[in-house]
Every structure is written in structure tokens, then in C-alpha cells.
């Protein structure tokens, strides 16, 4: 992927090898020159080839630290494709070629001519290769860097030459006085370019070495100045910081380290549209980005591309430190590689507790601090006076345990700046007056904070830090925070794995090394200080371009974090020292940015096309309607006024006598403009009617005003009289109208409506607005629910509400939904049935009770199943399951009468047309074993053994599990052979006892339970039981269910001890009914369950 990016910026050519080859050749000469300068042995071994290379090809003195250093810098610059290195090497090759040509013209000895010819051939080949590969040296140096380094080099060489001249005057050896200055100049300033034989005599060896060292020192100082000039540009301008703060206002919640992007010893590069940015430092040739890009994640790729282009431009190696998983993935997609660097410790105050064995150490530390009289106070930085902030800064400096402030990706590096007013200060105060410790945390979005600074006085009581962190979590609600980042611990996994029992030798060695270096860098201390709070560990990554660059990226990270301090480095709090604004010109032109670095005047998308990118692209019709709305507001028209009730519904207006004045409101579905006369179709919940607008009858405005203002779908209110138009249509003859709701999105086709079923589910509000059938369905559902309630209440049943959130998964065999309550740190279930609570009411003496409410089952979704559904459960004391056969039939028939006007279900024919099916009268009743026998053509009953049942299943092609008992196998046969094949409503009774854990055994038939299921057209509508009231037997059955649940069965019920204790107080003989109301509505209306529900669950888009 990296190669792809480079090829895109610089097309592939046959000369891409030249920079690396040139760097290797010069690097080898530099290495040999260095070795020869320190080792007489090496100098002796390479004397002959060195002299040939020195005479005819390339300057190669016998001893010169300075020249070795020069060549090393040149080799690195060539490999980095620096354009300035190309100029230097090409110029040198041209000069050397001219020197050889001159030697050929003056030479009179053949062996000298041969050497010069070889050298000239090499130079010409090198010059040709360099010229052809010129475009491969694209990397530039920072503006001004070369001039500063050159001036420093000239000054250093001058000073070194003068000092060397003085040493030669004091210790000349055999060197003649007239040659001493020129010898010093040659050794220091010319890097021993002239042969030593050109001078009369020679100095002492030590003085000669010192002269070479002076030249090397001048070069090294120049290199430091070169690097320092790069670091001096590691600085934000005020406008850049202002732009970054604007991005943080919008997207700061994405990254806990985002606020540290405002650190002012970083530079920044923006995406072209200004909606994302990357902050970075340049250290030892590595452009080191910190954390994730700041801003809109959709613009991260553009920001990363701009950053990588900058790296290529200057020949820097790209590196990233502290990226999140999301950020690392974005960098990987741009061609970098990711390596886990450590883990960030995140505390969630809602889950934080001091109780529990794992928090014992923290709890004890907090107790000690409180006993020592330590209290904690919280203040935002803006709440501190200048004197108080000065005191805070003084404490921070006095309590720092290092000479310089450390940090790059996890530290802000400043205190007391007015721009950081939202930072949070946590102080530990002993005895009410003395501050003994402090935490400073920067904002993490609007509801989080990220640790920036932690200080404690040497005399602070033990446990002070633990007390501050704990109080921060416990008082988080009053502070307005819901997440806290303690920043990340580097190499956390290495500490954990190396300390585990059975850790391998490599893991233990790696941990030992980290512990050793922790004496200086506090790696283990940071890990352990965070670990004790039981945080959530979130991985952080380092990113690099090539594995060979990992050491360089590591060194750059160590320098940037302050663990290794280079000469002339500046890491103290600074004002804005950047010279060039990096923010895009379009963003600067808005005038929003501030030169003092404070947040922009108006927070929002910026840059070319940013407004369009910030939200989904709006369709043309929506943009037209938005423009109309804007024009209305400009004219002072309220498109969404306060409501006033109309005098009539549309249905009432249609029924009114001619000439009746009415005020109706509704949605405009159609409009026809005939020039001066306009007709529209207006619909409210009750009906639809025509409205007629005539310029001659309108009291205010004209029909043109109407067409200019109103679109199809708008809500309007009209006032007029009922009458006939010229064509005889019964209409509202409008005299006044007003807009009461502007529809910003167009309605679907006026004749077809929403034809896609998925669209109808997702946009039910639109479906209801335009589809009469959808309105009739919701009316039918309401009528069915009302009829069920009315029937039960008419029989003396009491309606109740029981908990939806339940601690025990029980009441039915089904897979539940799991949730969690933070207040009690407790897992809860969404109820799968209200049964167990309703039975508690029965124990308490409520003899007729029902609940019509929502239940939840984490199971499949199809035409007859929805995870959230409406369930009726009813219980009648002193009754049994036979009572509910007539009771259930009456409920459903009454519901059908309420919805359809007669006792009918609607069923689709083969052509899709719905036809009524009569359900009046009594319904069939069959036993389960009898129905299965009828379907099999072979008799079975409760005494049929398991082997026979399995054989019959194999014969019928019905699958079963080996651990099922006979009852479970019969139930599976019933579901496949009977339930799925049933058409007209039928009650199937007397189910096997083993599959009915809450049902009493049959009073006369052993092995079956008094239970029936009502099935119609393959759909189970309801079930009823003679309830099991024996608490001993009930406990035994639930214990069996709980064993199944413990064994991994997700549908088995858990043991509800509170319910069993309630049953031990005795429940009267009771018959219970459970009915799926959604399925009843489905069969009554002839539609699928998704059509009958106003808002069924739909997959995310």
C-alpha cells in the first residue's frame, strides 16, 4: 500500500534505485574513513585502494573525522532523496571530472593517464546517472534551514581554524611557520582536501587529530542547528490552534487525546477542506504524529494523505504515536503498519465502586487519606483567579520530580492559559487550607476528561492520589462527566504476561528489561497506578511506514516525550511561535479564527463544500422546499405556528349542510391549478375532501400565493363554506387559508403510495399519511385491543401492570434480552412473560386478573414473529383450562366483530385478494396425541416408548435431539405434523407434562398436563393451563429447569426463589390464559405481523 501511495505521487521510473545506490556508496566511504581515522590497522589495510580513490575518484583522506561526518550526512541525505544532496554530489562529480580532464591534458606518464581515465569514466557515469535520476531527488529542506546551517558551519569552521592555527603556533612539530595557517585551514575548513605532502613538515599526531576534530565539531554544531531549525517550526500559529479547537468542539468526543493537539510545540497539517487535521513534530528526520487525526472521521483520509505528502516533500519518515484502534485503521488504509504500543486506562464513573475485594487496596488508601484530614475540591480553570492559578503553577513546578516537563501525545505542557478555561482542576486539601496534591484534566468532548498533570507534595498523606481519583468518579455526575481517561500505560501487556504463572523466558526477559528501565522512565509505576482502579483497557498503537524505520520512530518518540533531551531543545510552555498558518485559505477567509488560539466565533463545517459534506446530500426537491421555507421565514411567515382546533373534522364537514361555514385542517395530497381557480385534495384522520380556491372568493391573497407557498404534503388549515363547485363536486369553498406545517420531503406517488414493504415499515409515518389501508389497519388494531379489554373487564377481571425489567428469566421457555442497571450494578432481563408476577397477585387474593402489555423474546423474526410483541395473560381463580376454551374463543370473536363487523378472519387467496372466513360458533377440540396419531396414521399415546417415537420421527423425516425425552419428541412431532398443517381454529389439549413445567398434571390421565394450544392456519394464537398450584411440585420442576439453564440451555427458566416462596402461601385453583395479541390481529386482518404493528423492528440500513 505504501508503494501505491508513493507511485501515485512520483510515477515509477527505471532510475528509482539511484538515490539508494548513491547513499550506499557514499556511506561505505564514510564508514571506511571513520575507521581509518581511529585505527592505524585499518588505515594500513586500505592504503592502496584509498590512495587510488583519493587521487582519481573521490576525496578520501587517511584521517579526517570531519570528512567522515560530512560523508555520513551526505549519504543519509542521498538515501532520503534530498534535492540539496543531489546538487552537492552532482557538483562534486562535475568538479572531479574537470580535475581529471585537466590531469589528462597535463600528464606525461601512462599509468597516471590510466588512473585519470578510470576516474573520468566513473565521474561521467555518475553524472549521467544523477542527471537521469534528478526527479528521484524530490525531498526539500525546510525554508531557511540550509542558510542557518551554512552560516553556522562557516562560523564554526572559522573559529576552529583560528584555534587550530594557535595550537600549531604553540606545538608546530616540523611544520614551517608560513604553512601553519594554511595547514590549519586545510585540516579544519577544507576537511584535508589538499594532500599533506603539499606542506613542508608536519605537526604532532595529537594536534593533527585535534584539527580534524574541530572540523567535525563545526559540522556537528551545524547539524544541530539544522535539526533545531526544524524543531523551531514545530509550533502552532494562533489561527491554527483556533481551527483545531473548532474541530474539537465538533468531534472532540472521538479521541481522549484529542485536546492535546492544541499543544503548541507541534506543527499541523490540515485536510484540504479543513475538516480534519494532524498535529506532529519532526525529530531526527521522523515526522511524528500524535494520536488520531482531529476532526471529522470522514475527512481523516484526506488529512492523512496531506500529512504523508508533506513527509515525502521533505524526506521525513512518517510515524504515529498513540493512535486508537480507529485511527490506526485509518493510517493502515493509507499504507502504514500498526504495532500495539500500550493500553489506555478508561474509567466509567457509572460503573466505579469502592466495594469489592478487587478494590480493597484503593479503599484502604482512601480511608487513610480521609483520616489524615484530606478533602477534595473540583474547579474549572476559568473559576480560578490569577493569584490562585499562579499558586497552582508554583505547586506544579515545585512538586515535579524531573527537571523538564515531559510529554508529547499525552500532555498539554502548559498551565494557566486562558484558552484552557474548560480544563478541570482536582485538588487535595488537608485540614481545610493546605493543598497537598493536584490533578489537571483536559476536556474529552463535552462529557469526559483526560488526565494531563498529576502532582503531589512530598509530605502529602499516603492515599491522596487514590482519594482524588475516587472522588472524581464518585462526584462525576455533579461535575458533568461520564468518562475519565488516565492516559495509556506503555507495554501493559508485557508487564501482565511476564508476571503470569508459566510465562516463557522471552516474556520474563522482556518484562525484566521494562522493569529495569522503569527506574528512569516510570513505565511500571504508571501501569500499576492505573491498574488498581480496575479500568477498561483500550489499546493504543504506534504506526510506521517500514519495519526498518521502527528504531528511528522509537528514538523520535523518546525525544518527543522528553525522555531524551537534545541540545538546544525547547520544551517549556511557549506562546504561539509558528510563522506560517497551515489552515486552508477558505477557512482563514471566513474570519472565524482567532490569532490568540481561542475557539472560532461560530462552530460548524468549514471549507469548500463543507456544508454539503457535513450532512447527507439533500435531494433536489428537498433543497427546493428548504428554499421555500427560508423565503417564508424571510417574509415573516411562521411555517410551524401554534395550533388552534378546527371547527370540524373533514368527515363532519362532508356531512354538514350546504352553506355551513367550516374550518378544517389536513394534508394536501393533490392540487390542480386552472389559473385563478385551484382545486386540492385535503385529508385528515377522518376523511378526505376537495377544497376549492377561487380568486374571487378569497379574502386574503390569490391562488398564486397558494401555489407559491404550498407543496404536496404540506399541512394547511382552510376556512370556507360547504358547497358544490361548478362541476357539482361537494367541496369546501375556501375564503381563507394558512400554512400550519411545511413538509420538507416530497410524498411518494399520489396513486401508488409506498409500494416497497421495507420502505413502508421504515417510514410508517409516510405510509399512514398516504395509504388508507395503513390507517384502517391501525384502527383495526386499536379496536381489537379495546374489545379484548372490554370483554375481560365486563367479566369482572382487573387489569394490572407488572414489571418489564425482571431479575429472573422465567415465566416461559424462551431466550431473553439482557440489560444492565447501573444504579445497582445488576443484570436484568426484559420479561418474556408476566406470568410469575400475575400469579403472585393470585396468591394475594386477586381472583380475576389480566395484563395486556409488551413482552420480549430474543428469537427469530418472520411473518408471525417480532422480538417485541403484545401479550395477553389472564388468570381466573376456581377455574381450569376448559373454562378458557370458551373464554378465549369469545375474546377472539369479539375482537373480530370490533375490527371487521362480523365473526370473520381475512385470508389471502392464491391471487393475493383477501377473502373472509367465518369463525363463528364453537371450534374443534382435539388431544395432542390423537392429532399426532391422525397425522402419522399410526396410534401413539402417553405410554408409547421413546424408541418407538424416534422410529416414527425417522420415518416421517422429523429431526430430534438425542437428549430429548418422550414428551419433547411428541411436541416436535406435533409442531411439524399438526400445528403447521392446521387451518381453521382448533384447540389441541393435554400436552406431555415434561414440556409444561408450570402446568398441573391431568386429573385423570397420567403423563399429560392440563394445557391446550389454540392454532389457526399454522399460527399458535394462545395457550391455557390448569395452573400448577402445588408449591413442592412447582419447586421440583423449576429446579429441573434451572439445571438445564446452568447446563447452557438459553431458553430454560431460572429458579425464582421469591416466586416459589409466594406459592408456598397457597394459590387457589386457577385457570390461566396466554394469548399473542399481534397474531390475533394478524389473522383478523389477513396481514403479516410487520404490517399490523405500527413500528416493527427493522434491520439497520
From Swiss-Prot:
The chain crosses the membrane at residues 18-38, 60-80, 84-104, 113-133, 151-171, 183-200, 207-227. Its EC number is 6.1.1.6, 2.3.2.3. It is a multi-pass membrane protein. One of its GO terms (molecular function) is DNA binding. The keyword Ligase applies. The keyword Cell wall biogenesis/degradation does not apply. Pfam families: LPG_synthase_C, tRNA-synt_2, tRNA-synt_2_TM, tRNA_anti-codon. One of its GO terms (biological process) is lipid metabolic process. Residues 1-601 are annotated as: Phosphatidylglycerol lysyltransferase. Its cofactor is Mg(2+). Coiled coil: none annotated. Mg(2+) 1 binds at residues 1013, 1020. GO terms for cellular component: cytosol; plasma membrane. InterPro entries: Aa-tRNA-synt_II, aa-tRNA-synth_II, aa-tRNA-synth_II/BPL/LPL, LPG_synthase_C, Lys-tRNA-ligase_II, Lys-tRNA-ligase_II_N, Lys-tRNA-synth_II_C, NA-bd_OB-fold. Residues 602-1101 are annotated as: Lysine--tRNA ligase. In the N-terminal section; belongs to the LPG synthetase family. This is Lysylphosphatidylglycerol biosynthesis bifunctional protein LysX. It comes from Mycolicibacterium gilvum (strain PYR-GCK) (Mycobacterium gilvum (strain PYR-GCK)).
Amino acid at each position: 500500500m505504501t508503494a501505491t501511495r508513493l507511485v501515485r505521487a512520483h510515477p515509477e521510473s527505471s532510475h528509482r534505485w539511484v538515490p539508494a545506490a548513491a547513499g550506499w556508496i557514499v556511506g561505505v566511504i564514510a564508514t571506511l574513513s571513520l575507521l581509518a581515522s581511529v585505527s592505524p590497522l585499518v588505515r594500513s589495510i586500505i592504503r592502496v585502494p584509498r590512495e587510488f580513490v583519493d587521487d582519481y575518484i573521490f576525496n578520501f583522506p587517511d584521517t579526517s573525522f570531519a570528512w567522515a561526518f560530512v560523508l555520513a550526512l551526505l549519504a543519509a541525505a542521498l538515501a532520503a532523496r534530498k534535492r540539496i544532496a543531489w546538487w552537492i554530489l552532482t557538483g562534486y562529480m562535475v568538479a572531479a571530472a574537470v580535475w581529471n580532464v585537466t590531469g589528462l591534458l597535463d600528464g606525461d606518464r601512462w599509468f597516471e593517464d590510466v588512473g585519470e581515465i578510470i576516474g573520468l569514466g566513473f565521474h561521467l557515469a555518475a553524472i549521467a546517472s544523477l542527471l537521469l535520476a534528478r526527479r528521484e531527488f524530490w525531498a526539500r529542506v525546510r525554508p531557511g534551514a540550509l542558510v542557518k546551517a551554512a552560516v553556522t558551519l562557516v562560523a564554526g569552521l572559522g573559529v576552529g581554524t583560528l584555534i587550530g592555527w594557535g595550537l600549531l603556533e604553540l606545538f608546530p612539530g616540523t611544520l614551517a611557520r608560513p604553512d601553519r595557517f594554511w595547514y590549519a585551514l586545510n585540516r579544519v575548513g577544507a576537511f584535508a582536501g589538499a594532500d599533506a605532502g603539499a606542506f613542508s613538515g608536519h605537526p604532532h599526531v595529537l594536534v593533527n587529530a585535534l584539527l580534524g576534530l574541530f572540523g567535525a565539531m563545526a559540522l556537528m554544531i551545524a547539524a544541530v542547528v539544522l535539526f533545531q531549525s526544524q524543531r523551531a517550526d514545530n509550533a502552532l500559529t494562533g489561527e491554527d490552534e483556533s481551527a483545531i479547537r473548532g474541530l474539537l468542539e465538533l468531534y472532540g468526543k472521538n479521541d481522549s487525546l484529542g485536546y492535546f493537539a492544541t499543544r503548541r510545540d507541534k506543527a499541523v497539517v490540515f485536510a484540504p477542506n479543513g475538516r480534519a487535521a494532524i498535529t506532529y513534530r519532526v525529530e531526527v528526520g521522523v515526522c511524528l504524529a500524535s494520536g488520531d487525526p482531529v476532526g471529522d472521521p470522514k475527512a481523516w483520509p484526506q488529512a492523512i494523505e496531506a500529512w504523508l505528502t508533506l513527509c515525502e516533500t521533505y524526506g521525513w519518515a512518517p510515524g504515529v504515536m498513540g493512535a486508537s484502534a480507529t485511527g490506526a485503521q485509518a493510517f493502515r488504509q493509507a499504507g502504514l503498519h500498526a504495532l500495539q504500543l500500550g493500553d489506555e486506562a478508561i474509567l466509567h464513573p457509572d460503573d466505579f465502586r469502592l466495594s469489592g475485594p478487587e478494590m480493597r487496596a484503593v479503599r484502604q488508601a482512601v480511608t487513610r487519606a480521609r483520616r489524615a484530614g484530606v478533602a477534595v475540591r473540583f474547579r474549572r480553570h476559568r473559576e480560578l483567579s490569577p493569584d490562585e492559578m499562579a499558586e497552582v503553577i508554583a505547586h506544579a513546578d515545585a512538586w515535579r520530580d524531573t527537571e523538564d516537563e515531559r510529554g508529547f501525545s499525552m500532555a498539554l505542557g502548559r498551565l494557566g492559559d486562558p484558552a484552557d478555561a474548560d480544563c478541570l482542576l482536582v485538588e487535595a486539601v488537608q485540614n481545610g487550607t493546605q493543598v497537598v496534591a493536584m490533578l489537571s484534566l483536559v476536556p474529552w468532548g463535552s462529557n469526559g476528561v483526560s488526565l494531563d498533570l498529576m502532582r503531589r507534595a512530598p509530605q502529602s498523606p499516603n492515599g491522596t492520589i487514590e482519594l482524588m481519583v475516587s472522588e472524581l468518579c464518585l462526584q462525576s455526575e455533579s461535575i458533568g462527566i461520564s468518562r475519565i481517561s488516565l492516559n495509556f500505560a506503555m507495554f501493559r501487556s508485557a508487564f501482565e504476561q511476564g508476571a503470569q504463572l508459566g510465562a516463557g523466558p522471552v516474556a520474563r526477559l522482556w518484562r525484566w528489561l521494562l522493569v529495569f528501565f522503569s527506574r528512569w522512565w516510570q513505565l511500571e509505576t504508571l501501569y500499576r497506578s492505573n491498574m488498581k482502579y480496575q479500568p477498561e483497557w483500550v489499546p493504543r498503537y504506534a504506526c510506521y511506514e517500514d519495519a526498518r524505520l521502527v528504531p528511528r520512530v522509537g528514538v523520535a518518540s523518546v525525544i518527543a516525550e522528553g525522555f531524551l533531551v537534545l541540545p538546544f531543545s525547547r520544551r517549556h510552555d511557549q506562546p504561539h511561535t509558528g510563522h506560517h498558518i497551515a489552515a486552508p485559505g477558505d477557512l482563514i477567509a471566513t474570519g472565524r479564527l482567532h490569532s490568540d488560539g481561542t475557539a472560532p466565533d461560530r462552530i460548524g463545517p468549514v471549507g469548500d463544500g463543507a456544508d454539503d459534506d457535513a450532512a447527507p446530500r439533500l435531494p433536489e426537491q428537498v433543497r427546493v422546499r428548504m428554499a421555500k421555507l427560508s423565503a417564508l421565514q424571510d417574509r415573516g411567515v411562521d411555517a410551524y405556528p401554534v395550533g388552534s382546533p378546527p371547527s370540524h373534522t373533514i368527515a363532519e364537514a362532508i356531512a354538514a349542510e350546504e352553506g355551513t361555514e367550516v374550518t378544517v385542517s389536513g394534508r394536501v395530497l393533490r392540487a390542480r391549478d386552472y389559473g385563478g381557480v385551484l382545486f386540492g385534495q385535503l385529508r385528515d384522520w377522518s376523511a378526505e375532501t376537495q377544497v376549492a380556491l377561487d380568486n374571487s372568493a378569497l379574502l386574503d391573497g390569490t391562488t398564486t400565493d397558494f401555489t407559491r407557498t404550498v407543496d404536496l404534503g404540506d399541512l394547511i388549515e382552510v376556512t370556507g363554506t360547504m358547497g358544490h363547485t361548478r362541476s357539482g363536486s361537494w367541496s369546501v369553498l375556501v375564503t381563507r387559508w394558512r400554512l400550519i406545517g411545511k413538509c420538507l420531503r416530497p410524498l411518494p406517488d399520489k396513486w401508488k403510495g409506498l409500494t416497497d414493504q421495507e420502505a413502508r415499515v421504515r417510514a410508517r409515518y409516510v405510509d399512514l399519511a398516504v395509504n388508507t389501508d395503513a390507517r384502517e389497519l391501525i384502527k383495526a388494531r386499536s379496536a381489537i385491543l379495546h374489545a379484548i379489554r372490554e370483554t375481560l373487564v365486563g367479566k369482572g377481571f382487573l387489569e394490572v401492570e407488572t414489571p418489564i425489567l425482571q431479575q429472573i428469566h422465567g415465566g416461559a421457555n424462551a431466550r431473553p434480552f439482557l440489560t444492565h442497571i447501573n444504579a445497582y450494578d445488576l443484570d436484568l432481563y426484559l420479561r418474556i412473560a408476566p406470568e410469575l408476577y400475575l400469579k403472585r397477585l393470585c396468591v394475594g387474593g386477586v381472583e380475576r386478573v389480566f395484563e395486556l402489555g409488551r413482552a420480549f423474546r430474543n428469537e427469530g423474526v418472520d411473518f408471525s414473529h417480532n422480538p417485541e410483541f403484545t401479550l395477553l395473560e389472564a388468570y381466573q381463580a376456581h377455574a381450569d383450562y376448559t373454562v378458557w376454551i370458551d373464554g378465549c374463543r369469545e375474546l377472539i370473536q369479539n375482537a373480530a366483530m370490533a375490527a371487521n363487523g362480523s365473526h370473520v378472519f381475512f385470508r389471502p387467496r392464491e391471487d393475493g385478494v383477501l377473502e373472509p372466513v367465518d369463525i363463528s360458533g364453537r371450534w374443534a377440540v382435539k388431544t395432542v396425541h390423537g392429532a399426532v396419531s391422525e397425522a402419522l396414521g399410526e396410534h401413539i399415546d402417553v405410554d408409547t416408548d421413546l424408541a418407538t417415537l424416534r422410529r416414527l420421527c425417522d420415518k416421517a423425516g422429523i429431526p430430534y435431539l438425542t437428549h430429548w425425552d418422550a414428551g419433547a419428541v411428541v411436541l416436535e412431532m406435533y409442531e411439524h405434523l399438526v400445528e403447521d398443517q392446521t387451518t381453521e381454529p382448533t384447540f389441541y389439549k393435554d400436552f406431555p407434562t415434561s414440556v409444561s413445567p408450570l402446568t398441573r398434571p391431568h386429573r385423570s390421565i397420567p403423563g399429560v398436563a392440563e394445557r391446550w394450544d389454540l392454532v389457526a392456519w399454522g399460527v399458535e394464537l394462545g395457550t391455557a393451563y390448569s395452573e400448577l398450584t402445588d408449591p413442592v411440585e412447582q419447586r421440583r420442576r423449576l429446579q429441573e429447569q434451572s439445571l438445564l439453564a446452568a447446563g447452557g440451555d438459553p431458553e430454560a427458566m431460572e429458579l425464582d426463589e421469591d416466586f416459589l416462596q409466594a406459592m408456598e402461601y397457597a394459590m387457589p385453583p386457577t385457570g390461566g390464559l396466554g394469548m399473542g395479541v399481534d397474531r390475533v390481529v394478524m389473522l383478523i386482518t389477513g396481514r403479516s405481523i410487520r404490517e399490523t404493528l405500527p413500528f416493527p423492528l427493522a434491520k439497520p440500513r
